[in-house]
Swiss-Prot record:
Keyword flag Magnesium: yes
Organism listed in the record: Syntrophomonas wolfei subsp. wolfei (strain DSM 2245B / Goettingen)
Chief subcellular location: cytoplasm
Binding residue positions for Mg(2+): D45, D84, E116
UniProt-recorded name of the protein: 3-methyl-2-oxobutanoate hydroxymethyltransferase
Length: 276
């Protein structure tokens, strides 16, 4: 089976088939996500929160993203791997944006990049597309703008911001993005956007009417001890299982019951006798 492509995703929207996406940041989990048949793996700058321990995503660098993206690409065979462009990697100039987007493709082996912002990012999006690099848009709550928004808040609840969201979606669609993430917006507004634009929408906290869904894998597996957003469903609760395993390991090491005989290698007695 070949990797999922832009055309595959667009065909899914036409057939009204839902698109699945999850984040992943390491070889082990990325391999499992791929084997499960998830359409896209986003190497998200959310690794700043769930992997690197920052309060937000703003401290994540291009080198951080390339390092983790390489790992995810090596682990996956079928999913489209999308590299998330971090803060300031596409804000300074179009030239720098293209160079950084190119690193995700050339160095890491990703199939596409994602960047945040609406109408104000159209020229940047077009420049990256001119370099033959597929671009995923991201509007609504854009975490790299957390200080501008005054925190992590639902977007598009009043007429002015709802109109802005629709305009941004139209602008990105016309610019040529292959899909758009809608984050933390009212469900009915997300439905309007999804019905209006030609490319798939991927929701995170945007209700059931989007063409697809994405979650942070650490959240949906119940592995992250930090804040869990309202829109997250824990499909597993692994933290207590992991904690139990860690405590059992400690107890068995201290009691001398691990490693047991079945975990050990042997050597012939005559070899030992000839050591000294």
């Amino acid at each position: 089976m070949a990797r999922v492509t832009v055309s595959v995703l667009k065909d899914k929207k036409k057939r009204k088939e839902k698109i699945s996406m999850l984040t992943a940041y390491d070889y082990s989990l990325a391999g499992m996500v791929d084997e499960a048949g998830i359409d896209m793996i986003l190497v998200g700058d959310s690794l700043g929160n769930v992997v690197l321990g920052y309060d937000n995503t703003l401290a994540v660098t291009m080198d951080d993203m390339i390092h983790h993206s390489k790992t995810v690409v090596r682990a996956s065979k079928n999913a489209m791997v999308v590299g998330d462009m971090p803060f300031l990697s596409y804000h300074i100039s179009k030239k720098e944006a293209v160079r950084n987007a190119g690193r995700f493709i050339q160095e890491a082996g990703c199939s596409a990049v994602k960047l945040e912002g609406g109408s104000e990012r159209v020229d940047t999006v077009k420049a990256i597309l001119d370099a033959q690099i597929p671009v995923m848009g991201h509007i609504g709550l854009t975490p790299q703008s957390v200080h501008q928004f005054g925190g992590f808040k639902v977007q598009g609840k009043d007429l002015e911001t709802a109109k802005k969201l629709v305009e941004d979606a139209r602008a990105l669609d016309q610019a040529g993005v292959y899909c758009i993430v809608l984050e933390c917006v009212p469900s009915e507004l997300a439905r309007r956007v999804t019905e209006e634009i030609s490319v798939p929408t991927i929701g995170i906290g945007a209700g059931p009417y989007c063409d697809g869904q994405v979650l942070v894998i650490n959240d949906m597996l119940g592995m992250f001890r930090g804040f869990t957003p309202k829109f997250v469903r824990k499909f597993a609760n692994l933290e207590p299982l992991i904690m139990e395993a860690l405590k059992n390991y400690k107890a068995e090491v201290e009691a001398g019951t691990f490693p047991a005989e079945e975990h050990c290698f042997t050597i012939k007695e005559e070899v030992l006798d000839r050591l000294y």
